[in-house]
């Protein structure tokens, strides 16, 4: 193992959203902004919510339509456009890009996939556990985030945590806040 003095520090963003699904701003602008200040990025579309609640509640129809409409756009050409642009911006040794996407889950908590292969397919799943099973044997991290969200409402369910090659880390800090402690300097925002 190299000594600490031989190691280099790299800066990146492994979970950046844009308007390809339901984030803000143009996808190309997201890559350009990252390229101007970071060493690596994964612009991350929202891909699925297998256990989306509220199907029987007419008051939540707009929420369901908002999410499922974005997932449909991703599957109807958006993902191919996303993969192509991710490959376009990847410059080995200069600026690295990763194909990734996010899945929501009420039961397991939200997760983000981060793929080594730049042509990684969008994996359909019925749950986070199903996703992890289908991803076995592939070079992909499936990492939990929103650590500070409430359990049962997309907050991480630690009973589902599996250490190993698929989940070598968890997201502790994002624009939602610092999830290390409920006493952190930056309170958690659930928007």
Task: Tell what function each PLM region has.
Residues 1-191:
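Extended, charged catalytic domains and RNA/DNA-binding interfaces, predominantly
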């Amino acid at each position: 193992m190299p000594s600490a003095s031989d190691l280099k520090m790299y800066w990146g963003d492994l979970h950046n959203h844009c308007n390809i699904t339901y984030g803000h701003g143009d996808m190309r602008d997201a890559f350009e902004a990252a390229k101007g200040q970071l060493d690596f990025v994964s612009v991350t579309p929202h891909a699925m919510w297998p256990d989306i609640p509220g199907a029987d509640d007419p008051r939540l129809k707009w929420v369901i339509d908002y999410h499922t409409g974005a997932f449909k756009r991703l599957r109807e050409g958006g993902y191919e456009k996303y993969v192509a642009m991710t490959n376009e911006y990847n410059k080995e040794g200069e600026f690295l890009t990763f194909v990734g996407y996010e899945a929501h889950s009420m039961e397991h908590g939200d997760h983000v996939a981060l793929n080594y292969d730049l042509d990684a397919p969008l994996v359909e799943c019925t749950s986070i556990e199903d996703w992890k099973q289908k991803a076995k044997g592939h070079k992909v991290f499936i990492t939990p985030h929103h650590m500070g969200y409430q359990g049962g409402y997309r907050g991480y369910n630690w009973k589902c945590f599996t250490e190993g090659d698929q989940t070598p880390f968890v997201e502790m800090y994002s624009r939602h806040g610092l999830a290390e402690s409920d006493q952190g300097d930056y309170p958690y925002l659930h928007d």
